[in-house]
A protein has these predicted regions:
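Mature-chain termini and adjacent capping regions
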Residues: 1-201
């Protein structure tokens, strides 16, 4: 009985260690940088330029026509992207003219994007949310999206417009700042044809 109990405890400890190792591996996924259009490395000034760039870390991907980085250490750094910038995550995406992406502890932590306008989209099981603004600040760790400047957000049959909207992707909560807000409730789709009248008895 004691031996059997000891084996169960040992198995539980091994399973817990394996789960912890798996979580650690996810946090330490490698970041791959590909420059299809070439590079320009100025080592004397620590400026690195990439053309036709794609950065991938697991299911997170960034593509742009150009990128500039002050150093290649992406454990804790900031990169500037410009030209047809697209940032895709497992359940969301951003598109913009320019972007500043921050790397923290070896992973992408946030993205500040600007455009005319910049756009955002989140996919959920049976619906989606999308928005646009002059600037969008996306915090991957907190799961928040700040739409700043002519902000518009569509979610769950509602359209919200305002100067600044803060959207939480985890609980679908919207907070407005810096001025009035207009909310438009969209009706359900009308039937394409009128129902047939019931036959008279």
């Amino acid at each position: 009985m004691a031996a059997s109990s000891s084996r169960r405890i040992a198995a539980a400890i091994l399973a817990a260690c394996a789960a912890a190792a798996g979580a650690q591996e996810r946090d330490q996924l490698p970041i791959q940088v590909e420059a299809r259009g070439g590079t320009d490395f100025d080592y004397s000034n620590g400026v690195f330029k990439f053309y036709g760039i794609t950065i991938t870390q697991g299911a997170v991907k960034i593509t742009a026509e150009r990128a500039i980085a002050n150093g290649l250490d992406i454990k804790d750094s900031s990169w500037e992207f410009s030209g047809a910038v697209h940032i895709t995550m497992p359940d969301s995406a951003l598109a913009s003219d320019t972007a500043r992406v921050r790397f923290s502890a070896g992973e992408i932590s946030s993205a500040d994007v600007t455009g005319a306008p910049a756009t955002f989209r989140q996919e959920r099981k049976e619906e989606h949310a999308e928005g646009r603004a002059n600037r969008i600040d996306y915090d991957l760790k907190r799961g928040t999206v700040v739409l700043d400047g002519d902000a518009w957000l569509s979610d769950s049959g509602k359209e919200i417009t305002g100067a600044k909207l803060i959207y939480s992707m985890t609980n679908q909560r919207v907070v407005s700042e810096d001025g009035p807000v207009v909310i438009t409730i969209l009706p359900g789709e009308a039937p394409q044809t009128a129902p047939k009248p019931k036959p008279q008895p």
